[in-house]
Regions:
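Conserved alpha/beta-hydrolase "acid-adjacent" motif
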Residues: 7, 246-248
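Proline-aspartate-enriched helix->loop->beta-strand connector
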Residues: 21, 232-238
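A short acidic, amphipathic alpha-helical/loop segment
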Residues: 9-13, 197-201, 223-231, 252-256
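Flexible, acidic/histidine-containing loops and adjacent segments that form or flank the divalent-metal
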Residues: 7-187, 191, 259-267, 271-327
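Nucleic-acid-processing active sites and adjacent nucleic-acid-binding tracks
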Residues: 198-203, 207, 219
Length: 327
């Protein structure tokens, strides 16, 4: 989805002629510019009559629609310059025109009760299933649920006004990678109302179980316990920067992840302290998290901050049986 921490760094990569790409997948929600009249800066909301949940249009599809959006003048800043999303689209079009990008595609799930949606460019030994975003209807115009801040919910207002951040994050692309008989879940920036919505859409099925769970939204407190219980992983990975005002991952997210994991020794791995800069500006990378699978066994590894001669990584085979292997 088009939050800056998920796409802005790719602009430089897309503009680099030494890189080639197959497809760019996205959730269909563009980031409009200043004073365009677009709801939530994302699209057009459905009517709010009745106080129920609302939906929003999807207005980005392929590279042709990207070109149309750029020509519309709706992706400009207050100073009439391209906003960051426009810069991303221009970089994608440049890569396409140079033969370095194959396609841009919107990725959604239309019928949660239907057959699994598997990305076409994955194979039988390693497949990627698309679980979200789930459209509000299996047919007709492609609209997504507009999500609210759960802190604003009251007994008389179960669906308060949706917000830009909860809607863009809540409609993250969610993927489950299956390698052999092992599964990895990637939940993007899903939040609590989105996780509840997905549970309702898929009920009574549970497509979210996985041995390894990439924690949603870098370890935010905005999560639904029932979602964590449905995933029930052996290991959870939190990916977040060391700086910033959000202090992710938060203690409740890490604690809940451990409590609702499987096994006596659930693993919670975090990239929070991932690098160090000395007085000369030299960056030393550490705390890297690595997952390896042969289809029947998964090994998680975390790089030591100060590797010894005999050991660079801490390694854990899943399900982890503890430091003494049950002996």
């Amino acid at each position: 989805h088009f939050d800056q921490d998920h796409y802005y760094g790719l602009i430089r990569v897309l503009n680099d002629p030494s890189f080639e790409f197959g497809k760019i997948y996205h959730n269909g929600l563009p980031r409009y510019g200043f004073n365009t009249g677009k709801d939530l800066n994302l699209g057009t909301l459905s009517s709010s009559s009745g106080g129920g949940p609302r939906s929003i249009t999807t207005e980005l599809r392929d590279l042709a629609s990207a070109q149309t959006l750029l020509a519309s003048g709706l992706l400009l800043t207050e100073n009439h310059n391209d906003n960051n999303f426009a810069l991303f689209l221009r970089a994608a079009l440049k890569a396409s025109n140079e033969g370095r990008l194959g396609a841009m595609r919107m990725l959604v799930k239309r019928n949660p009760g239907g057959t699994a949606k598997i990305l076409s460019d994955t194979g039988p030994d390693c497949s990627i299933e698309v679980l979200a975003p789930v459209t509000t209807s299996p047919t007709g115009p492609i609209r997504l649920r507009a999500f609210h801040d759960p802190h604003k919910v009251t007994a008389t207002a179960p669906f308060p006004s949706p917000t830009e951040s909860h809607t863009i994050n809540g409609n993250s692309i969610v993927l489950r990678l299956r390698h052999g008989n092992k599964e990895f879940l990637f939940g993007g920036d899903l939040n609590q109302p989105a996780q509840k919505y997905l549970a309702e859409k898929y009920a009574p099925a549970n497509p979210f179980s996985a041995e390894v769970n990439k924690a949603c939204h870098h370890g935010s407190s905005d999560f639904e316990l029932e979602y964590l219980k449905a995933v029930h992983p052996c290991a959870t990975v939190f990916s977040s920067g060391d700086a910033g005002s959000y202090d992710h991952p938060l203690p409740d997210a890490m604690g809940a992840a451990a409590k609702h994991s499987s096994g006596e020794f659930p693993l919670v791995l975090s990239t929070e302290l991932a690098r160090e800069t000395d007085s000369k500006g030299k960056i030393k990378l550490m705390g890297h998290i690595n997952a390896r699978s042969n289809g029947s066994t998964i090994v998680m590894a975390q790089k030591k901050e100060k590797p010894s001669e005999s050991k660079t990584w801490y390694t854990f085979e899943l399900p982890y049986a503890g430091p003494f292997g049950g002996h």
